[in-house]
C-alpha cells in the first residue's frame, strides 16, 4: 500500500473585533483570530496536512490570502474543497490528529464539537479524528495570549496502488 503522511501548521494573531472560530466552532471570547478568511487555525493546519500528504502544495497555493474570493471564507468550505482535491488525486483519508495551542480560552468544552465538524467535512468516522488542546505554559507569544497555533498530521492511502 502507498501510505502518505502530511504535517500541517498554522498560527494567527488574537485581536479585538473578530469572532473566535476553531474547528468550525464559534467560541465565546473577547478576541478572535486575525486573517483573510475566518482564520480557523485548526482547519487551516488540517488542510495543509492533507495537501502536503498528497504532495499538492499548501493552503496558500489553493486558497490565496490575496484572492478576494476567499475574503471572510468559511474554512469548513475550504477544507471540504481540499478533501475533494485530495480524493481527485487518488487518495483516501485514513485519519487526522491535531493539536491546538492556546493559553486562553479553555478549549476542552469545545473539542467534541470540533471533532464532529472535522469528521463530517472529511467524510470520516469520529474515531478517526482527534483534536487535542494544550497551553504554552505562559511561555512566548502564545503564552502571553497574543495568538493561537495549531498543528496537524494526516494519513492518506493511494487508491488502487
Curated annotation (Swiss-Prot):
Q: Kindly state which reaction or reactions the protein catalyses.
A: 4-CDP-2-C-methyl-D-erythritol 2-phosphate = 2-C-methyl-D-erythritol 2,4-cyclic diphosphate + CMP
State the EC number(s): 4.6.1.12
Site described as Transition state stabilizer, located at 36, 135
Q: Which GO BP terms, alphabetically?
A: isopentenyl diphosphate biosynthetic process, methylerythritol 4-phosphate pathway; terpenoid biosynthetic process
What this protein needs as a cofactor is: a divalent metal cation
Amino acids binding 4-CDP-2-C-methyl-D-erythritol 2-phosphate: 10-12, 36-37, 58-60, 63-67, 144
Q: In which pathway does it act?
A: Isoprenoid biosynthesis; isopentenyl diphosphate biosynthesis via DXP pathway; isopentenyl diphosphate from 1-deoxy-D-xylulose 5-phosphate: step 4/6
Q: How is the cofactor bound?
A: Binds 1 divalent metal cation per subunit.
Citing just one GO molecular function, the answer is: metal ion binding
Q: According to the lineage, what is the superkingdom?
A: Bacteria
Q: Which NCBIfam families match?
A: ispF
Quaternary structure and partners:
Homotrimer.
What family is reported? Belongs to the IspF family.
What's the protein called, per UniProt? 2-C-methyl-D-erythritol 2,4-cyclodiphosphate synthase
Amino acid at each position: 500500500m502507498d501510505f502518505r503522511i502530511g504535517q500541517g501548521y498554522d498560527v494567527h494573531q488574537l485581536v479585538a473585533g473578530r469572532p473566535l472560530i476553531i474547528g468550525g466552532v464559534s467560541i465565546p471570547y473577547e478576541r478572535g483570530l486575525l486573517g483573510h478568511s475566518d482564520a480557523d487555525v485548526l482547519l487551516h493546519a488540517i488542510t495543509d496536512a492533507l495537501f502536503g500528504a498528497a504532495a499538492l502544495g499548501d493552503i496558500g497555493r489553493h486558497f490565496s490570502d490575496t484572492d478576494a474570493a476567499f475574503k471572510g471564507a468559511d474554512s469548513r468550505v475550504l477544507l471540504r474543497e481540499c478533501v475533494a482535491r485530495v480524493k481527485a488525486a487518488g487518495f483516501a483519508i485514513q485519519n487526522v490528529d491535531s493539536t491546538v495551542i492556546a493559553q486562553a480560552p479553555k478549549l476542552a468544552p469545545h473539542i467534541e464539537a470540533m471533532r464532529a465538524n472535522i469528521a463530517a467535512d472529511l467524510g470520516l468516522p469520529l474515531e478517526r479524528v482527534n483534536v487535542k488542546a494544550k497551553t504554552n505554559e505562559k511561555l512566548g507569544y502564545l503564552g502571553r495570549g497574543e495568538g493561537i497555533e495549531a498543528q496537524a498530521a494526516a494519513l492518506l492511502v493511494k487508491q488502487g496502488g
